[in-house]
Amino acid sequence: MPQIEELRRQRAGINEQIQALATIEATNGTLTAEQLTEFAGLQQQFTDISAKMDRMEATERAAALVAKPVKATQHGPAVIVKAEPKQYTGAGMTRMVMSIAAAQGNLQDAAKFASDELNDQSVSMAISTAAGSGGVLIPQNIHSEVIELLRDRTIVRKLGARSIPLPNGNMSLPRLAGGATASYTGENQDAKVSEARFDDVKLTAKTMIAMVPISNALIGRAGFNVEQLVLQDILTAISVREDKAFMRDDGTGDTPIGMKARATQWNRLLPWAADAAVNLDTIDTYLDSIILMSMDGNSNMISSGWGMSNRTYMKLFGLRDGNGNKVYPEMAQGMLKGYPIQRTSAIPANLGEGGKESEIYFADFNDVVIGEDGNMKVDFSKEASYIDTDGKLVSAFSRNQSLIRVVTEHDIGFRHPEGLVLGTGVLF
């Protein structure tokens, strides 16, 4: 095509020269012998160039008729760009677990899975640098996200217990055991001297192991919905055990000493009268007595709240007066007598000789501290067994499952005993 354009420009130039000679002839009437020779030469050049252009154009038309379309496969390879993974609280923990499971515990492959399949470079880097004995050590920032999520699931955390670091697994917190006193005195008389007495709240890390079975059909798959399934299973396993530990464990078997054991130790129990009728008046009076016991203990009551069984909660929620009005309508907003209320299955409703009793916990959770060691480890197994909800030993291999083991360490302590009240023998 460029050659044809050049020939057209040449032919146009020759035509201008021919037209100039023709103008001379038209004006003067005759051309000289030299001009006639030039005219004949230019005319021949014009004819030759035109013929050459005709041949070149014919060649291009013929080539176009027999040309084949370019196939799509002749293009360069497509560039596939994976979408950025969705970020949410707990995403790091979930993707670490999924990567370790997909790689069957091989940390090098797990880091590659996080990078290539999940497209999360930060998780890949965390796996590469967090190897430790007994599993993969979860980085502190990811561990903090898990604690934040547990706050909405564990009622002790939800009601305001404060989480503090537990360096090296131990900590002693000073607490006021006996307050200083004040007195009046007359002129020229000595004031009575008194001082506050302190002792320590000692926290020692207790190891909790959560076994989380995951279907092998989910392993190796990426996606937000799969991640949510894995995350919820992990949080449920941890939160259910934490509720029981923080409220009802007694320190045996390397467990924390929970609220019930401390309330018993400090004589902060308020039993329901066994012969009392269960009705609106007796229930309301009993709840007032629990609050009053906390007040009379000079509790600061900065962040007081209720914890109770599901049965007790529903009894109070559905309690109505003689006009059919709900007695405690504020429970719809999560409050009871002006204080936050939470329920949990970790508080039984089948206690006592007849299996009909339950418990009500009332505490100033501002004085409840949960010491977090900060070390959380994750490990994987395809052959291990676990105990299901019925207490039966289950083989993960026989159920086409894999087990994720999450190891964390913590303890619970209470800075002021007077802020804790435990209602026992509750029949509603």
Curated annotation (Swiss-Prot):
One Pfam short name: Phage_capsid
Lineage: superkingdom: Viruses
Coiled coil: 4-24
Bilayer-spanning residue ranges: none
Record's GO cellular component terms: virion component
Coiled coil in keyword set: yes
SUPFAM superfamilies in alphabetical order: Major capsid protein gp5 (SSF56563)
Keywords: Coiled coil, Late protein, Viral capsid assembly, Viral release from host cell, Virion
Family to which this protein belongs: Belongs to the HK97 phage major capsid protein family.
Protein's name according to its UniProt entry: Major capsid protein
